[in-house]
């Protein structure tokens, strides 16, 4: 299962905090998968078949700080454990254009991840794809920064990193299996 963390509503779609959903939309488009609204999972879902691996996709359609409800609901329904899920999210500690895969336990201050960990109520490592969005100079501006739209240069770097990450999914699938 691959989850792209996001906030709902059209006004947040292009914000830095929603880069996880950008990834899922790009991945679905790349593999000709259709995302559809699934109210029982509080989000949009799809499926991929990559190298004979059936992979479920999820974009929660609820606010970031409660994305765990959506992730846990879908994972429980399909009997998927947290360590079998790739969570794709924005990362303030990486510059735009930088991505990093991580397999560990923890949220690094990210409220979406924090809520997922709370909902699963288990201390296990899980996969994360961290997509760099950069950090504002003033730490008091973090909330407004993540809820703002990247400038043209940043957007180009972020989209390029997402394209690269999608090409590297085959490598990641070998790790998950």
From Swiss-Prot:
Q: Which GO terms describe its biological process?
A: protein quality control for misfolded or incompletely synthesized proteins; rescue of stalled ribosome
What residues correspond to the site Discriminates between blocked and unblocked aminoacyl-tRNA?
Answer: 7
What InterPro entries does its record include?
Answer: Pept_tRNA_hydro, Pept_tRNA_hydro_sf
Keywords, ordered alphabetically: Cytoplasm, Hydrolase, RNA-binding, tRNA-binding
Q: Its GO CC terms?
A: cytoplasm
Report the EC number(s), separated by commas if there are several. Answer: 3.1.1.29
Q: Which residues bind tRNA?
A: 12, 63, 65, 111
- What reaction gets catalysed by this protein? an N-acyl-L-alpha-aminoacyl-tRNA + H2O = an N-acyl-L-amino acid + a tRNA + H(+)
Q: Name one GO molecular function term.
A: peptidyl-tRNA hydrolase activity
**Catalytic residues, chain numbering:** 17
Q: Does the keyword Cytoplasm apply?
A: yes
Q: According to its UniProt record, where is this protein located?
A: Cytoplasm
Locate the site labelled Stabilizes the basic form of H active site to accept a proton. 90
Please name one Pfam family that this protein belongs to.
Pept_tRNA_hydro
The family note in this entry says: Belongs to the PTH family.
This molecule's function is given as:
Hydrolyzes ribosome-free peptidyl-tRNAs (with 1 or more amino acids incorporated), which drop off the ribosome during protein synthesis, or as a result of ribosome stalling.
Q: Give the record's subunit note.
A: Monomer.
NCBIfam families from the UniProt entry: pth (TIGR00447)
Protein's recorded name? Peptidyl-tRNA hydrolase
The species this protein belongs to is Buchnera aphidicola subsp. Schizaphis graminum (strain Sg)
Q: Which gene encodes it?
A: pth
């Amino acid at each position: 299962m691959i989850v792209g963390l996001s906030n709902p509503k059209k006004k947040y779609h292009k914000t830095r905090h929603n880069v996880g959903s950008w990834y899922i939309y790009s991945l679905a488009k790349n593999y000709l998968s259709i995302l559809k609204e699934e109210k029982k999972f509080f989000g949009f879902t799809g499926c991929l078949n990559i190298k004979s691996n059936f992979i479920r996709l999820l974009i929660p359609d609820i606010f970031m700080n409660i994305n765990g409800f959506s992730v846990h609901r879908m994972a429980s329904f399909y009997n998927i454990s947290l360590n079998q899920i790739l969570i794709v999210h924005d990362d303030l500690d990486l510059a735009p254009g930088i991505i990093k895969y991580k397999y560990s336990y923890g949220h690094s201050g990210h409220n979406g991840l924090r809520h997922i960990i709370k909902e699963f109520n288990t201390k296990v490592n899980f996969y994360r794809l961290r997509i760099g969005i950069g950090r504002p100079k003033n730490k008091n501006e973090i909330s407004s920064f993540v809820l703002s739209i990247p400038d043209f240069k940043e957007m180009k770097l972020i989209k390029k990193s997402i394209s690269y990450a999608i090409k590297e999914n085959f490598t990641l699938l070998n790790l998950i299996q």
